[in-house]
Each structure stands twice: as structure tokens, then as C-alpha cells.
Amino acid sequence: MALSKEEIDKYWHDWFMVDALKAEKLFTKTFRLLPRDPRCKICASPFDGMGGLVMRTVFGRGRSELNPQFCSICEDYVKKHQGGAEVEMAILFADIRGSTALSEQMTPMDFQKLINRFYVGATKIISEENGLVEKLAGDAVAAFWGAGIAGKNYVERTIRAAQKISKNMEAQNIPVGIGVHAGVAYFGAMGSEDGLADISAIGDEVNTTARIASKAAAGEILVSEVALEQAGIKAGELESRVLELKGISEQVSVRVMRG
């Protein structure tokens, strides 16, 4: 039986905010018996070891390339159940600085390899910190975290992911600036009537995060005061800045961190 819009929206809210691992379905309980972690955040199917091999060969459940927190079947399922809800989340945007100039100094193949190293390094760290990749676009990566997926310390994990990404990119000589913010956004599967959809987050706080990231120089992580407070991190001696952001009516206070 098809779910109503209200049921779909509640599913999205509870899954993101409450606990992504509390689905009480028989197949979920069964999958949890198979070794071993890491697992799909929705159905609990294992990705590695013998359990992962069984899931891939018998059930056709491989790890999603875009969101390693999901298996491919669950990602397809949530995309087909379009809907969403306003939820508390933490958001991260990371951009390569001076990408146009870099591309002019490199062959197209070498530039593509640099972008790929950026994508691979960033998404691996986001997955390790239980974040969800929203998009890989051009020279940027966007991701978000919620309590149901990453735990109650999801804002802290977002900041930790930003520090790891910054350190990883510095080691690879890839100039990246990062912005981190937290607030309420609309989260869910959005798309067209023909069934094409993406798991996305939209709203003022998402736009604010993108604008914050645009102000970060290479090697800098600009974290909003709101995110720092929610993470329980004391600003201490961290450099303070007040940003005027395009399209944002109010100034935004941030602190400067590094990897």
C-alpha cells in the first residue's frame, strides 16, 4: 500500500532526527546478524567481509557510490519516496580555491585527477564521520549531518570532518576552504514527476553555509558561532570574524579554525 504524504514526511523526519537504525523490519533484523560493520544506515546490511559478499551476490545490495552510508537499494528507495521535513542539521561546504587558475596551469587530465583526489578524500572522511554527501559539483563538496545518523554530537562530528578534510587536502597540496554552520533546513528526496530525485537539503541555513565557505581562504575553516555553541566547543583564542554575505540580510559571526 502506498504511503501518504504525511507518512512519508514523518519517515524522513524520524529517520534523520531520531535514529536511522531503528527500522523494525524483519529484513533489517536479519541483516544485522550478518558480519560485519560498516553497514547501511537504513537496512543495516553489511558492506565488508563475508556478510558484504552475501549482500552483493544474493541480494544485490552494494554500497552507494555517492553516499557510502547507504546501500544502493535503500538509496534508490528513499529517492522514489519523495517528501521531507524541516530538521535540525549541521552543514559543511568545501571548495577548491583558485580552481580556474589551477586548471589553466594543468592539463585537463591532471586537473581531473586533482578534482578526483579531492572528491575521494573528502567523501571518505564524511563517511567516517557519519555524514551524508549532498552533492559533488565542479570544485565543491556539500554534506550534512543529523542526530539520527551521526548521533547527538553530530555538530561536533561535522567540525571534526572539516578539520580532517582540511588536513588531508593540505597534505595533497590541494587548496581548499571550508564553511560549517548549523540550523533548521528542509531535508528529503526532491525531484521531478518522472521519478528522478536526489536526497537534498535546502533553505536559508544551507545557503548561509555556502556563503560562509566562499569567504574561507585555502586552509581555513570558517565555523559559525551557532555551530560552535551547539557543538559545545569554546572559541577560546580562535580568530573571530563578522561576515557580510551576499544574499544574507544579517551579518554572520564565525571563528577561524584549521585542520
Where are these regions (language model features)?
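Regulatory cytosolic signal-relay segments
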Residues: M1-V87, A235
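Amphipathic alpha-helical regulatory segments at dimerization interfaces
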Residues: K29, Y77, G121-I125, K164-A171, ...
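Short amphipathic alpha-helical segments
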Residues: D37, P68, S72, N116, ...
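Catalytic NTP-binding/metal-coordinating core of nucleotidyl cyclase/transferase enzymes
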Residues: H81-R160
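Alpha-helix/helix-capping structural signal
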Residues: R97, V184-A185, N207, V226
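Catalytic core of nucleotidyl cyclases, primarily class III adenylyl/guanylyl cyclases
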Residues: I125-R157, N168-D204, V252-V254
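Cytosolic regulatory/linker segments at or just downstream of nucleotide-handling modules
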Residues: K215-G259
